Amino acid sequence: MKIRIISEIKELYSIKDDWDDLYSKADYSTFQSFEFNYYSWLTELSKAKGNQLCVILLTTNERACAILPLYIDFKKRLRFINDKHADFCDVLSNEKFDFEDILSEIRKHFKLYSVHFINLTEDSFLYALYKKKVWKNSLLKSFEKYSTLNLDKGTFPYNVLKYTSKQKTEFRRIKKKSAENTHHFLLKDNSNFPIQDIYQLKERMIGLGLRKANFLNEDRLILLKELYNSNRMIVSMVKSKSNICAISFILRNTNEYLFWIDMYDNSKMINIYNYISFIERISQENNTKINFGRGVYDYKVTNFKPDIKQLFAFYIFSNKLQLLIFLFVDNIKEILKSIYKKIKR
């Protein structure tokens, strides 16, 4: 098995076919797709001082057998590309490999202080890798949570057996309240990327104080447009006459749909109405899995009753002192979060 480090954007584009081939052979999320990683690096991460592209390509008999979509940040931490905004992180691989060999190769070329792999599911390659081996100066810890809802083909919400009559009535009430609105289901095949609608709603959200001024900057919009144009993303939109009330950017992977980024104004329950309208439409066609993404928000849990699952983070440090410092700082952060939650109540 040969290890190749991709450190330049031109090199990265040159392995697109290998990447697409590996991606097609397993049930990866959109966050492991070439488009997400390439445009995340090109439009955002490459512009930040101190970041170094460090994608790993493993080959056996001249054929790609694994890709690790990584970079090194200004603190010399090895991370997944765009891990802050990727709900799920993982490698693409159809063969086992020794991660220690990869780390050794990276250290021959770049200074590296630690490894920070976040947003790992229990069935991710790297979670399994950690469980099979004792790693010196390492840590596996619970990270955030995510939630999913499986639906049989049929009419929502009646195709979700666990919903009570009261819950179904509540869905009908929300739909009735927004009856004057129209729902739009946008794909590359039927509509151009709705950039002007996005700008309009973005400005309204900022004006209403619902988002900060840097929300959905131009670099992020380029990434969204590329995902849309590569058919990896759907736009679910709600209009009220000439006004855009809600937009959801939904990542698609066969019959699984992930609500990634939501936009909405101050119309009551408008984001929930957008969710209901999309789920209603998509589950009429096939058995469907809805992924509500990373972060367990009360309004999603209360309304949709999804299954909640745990994400994990895997860290490796250069020495024991680094590990102890990380644990100390992490504990302080948890204490401050706990105090903040109590104050908010």
Features from the language model and the residues they span:
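A gly/proline- and charged-residue-enriched helix-loop-helix capping module
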Residues: 83-110
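Active-site/acyl-donor-binding loops of N-acyltransferases
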Residues: 5, 9, 130-159, 234, ...
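Short, well-ordered beta-to-alpha junction loops that form the rim of enzyme active sites
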Residues: 119-122, 294-296
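A conserved beta-strand-loop-helix scaffold within acyl/acetyltransferase catalytic domains
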Residues: 3-61, 65-78, 120-144, 154-266
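Divalent metal-dependent hydrolysis catalytic cores, especially in the metallo-beta-lactamase
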Residues: 112-120
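Aromatic (often tryptophan-rich) hydrophobic motifs at membrane interfaces
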Residues: 97, 101-107, 211-326
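Short amphipathic alpha-helical segments
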Residues: 1, 87-89, 183
